[in-house]
Amino acid sequence: MDVMKGTTTVGLICDDAVILATDKRASLGNLVADKEAKKLYKIDDYIAMTIAGSVGDAQAIVRLLTAEAKLYKMRTGRNIPPLACATLLSNILHSSRVFPFLTQIIIGGYDLLEGAKLFSLDPLGGMNEEKTFTATGSGSPIAYGVLEAGYDREMSVEEGIKLAINALKSAMERDTFSGNGISLAVITKEGVKIFEDEEIEKILDGMKAKSKKKTTKRGRRKSK
């Protein structure tokens, strides 16, 4: 089912970690309805997810999945595995296929036995386990181009963060329904880390400084 609602979210696997990133713009037709929309959620100690599509449907899924993860931990004493979490959501979405949740989901998690895990789900419950990267939303075609060009399975977490940010930045420059900042999370064996705005700004400043340095070096070579 093709649902490309306004937003851009990306997920990728690198160096035994999962990186999730989203923009912050919520649109209502051609209106920018919210410039600080939350599209990245922590579900469990080792699982986070991104949302794209209908806000009400997406938030209902977040509440449901968070509650199910807590119940699983109460019953078993363990955190719900990422595959079990994604499969549960797939079954929930499929059971509502007559009146579907109009949303696209990316689930990223870390399994202490199997390592980094990444899944994408469509509104009818179709689930794919992604071995490299994925993207959703109206800006996803642009984000995919950047991810295809720059992805390396062996890249470090730092390199993966920069690639995810570059994919989002490119989408925000060309897609009118994406923009207004970036949300970022890294999931490792240590758990889910959701970055503060100040931390993201610091990363962006570092990327700008590095890019400016490269441009200056090229200019000097040409002048010679």
UniProtKB/Swiss-Prot annotation:
Propeptide residue interval(s): 1-6
Secretion signal span: none
Record-linked InterPro entries: Ntn_hydrolases_N, Pept_T1A_Psome_bsu_arc, Pept_T1A_subB, Proteasome_bsu_CS, Proteasome_sua/b, Proteasome_suB-type
Broad class of enzyme this protein falls into: hydrolase
Location of this chain's protein in the cell: Cytoplasm
EC number: 3.4.25.1
Catalytic-site annotation from UniProt: 7 (nucleophile)
Key word NADP present: no
Keyword line: Autocatalytic cleavage, Cytoplasm, Hydrolase, Protease, Proteasome, Threonine protease, Zymogen
Biological-process GO terms, alphabetical: proteasomal protein catabolic process
Enzymatic reactions: Cleavage of peptide bonds with very broad specificity
PANTHER family, alphabetized: ATP-DEPENDENT PROTEASE SUBUNIT HSLV, METALLOPROTEASE TLDD
Subunit structure: The 20S proteasome core is composed of 14 alpha and 14 beta subunits that assemble into four stacked heptameric rings, resulting in a barrel-shaped structure. The two inner rings, each composed of seven catalytic beta subunits, are sandwiched by two outer rings, each composed of seven alpha subunits. The catalytic chamber with the active sites is on the inside of the barrel. Has a gated structure, the ends of the cylinder being occluded by the N-termini of the alpha-subunits. Is capped at one or both ends by the proteasome regulatory ATPase, PAN.
Family: Belongs to the peptidase T1B family.
Name recorded for this polypeptide: Proteasome subunit beta
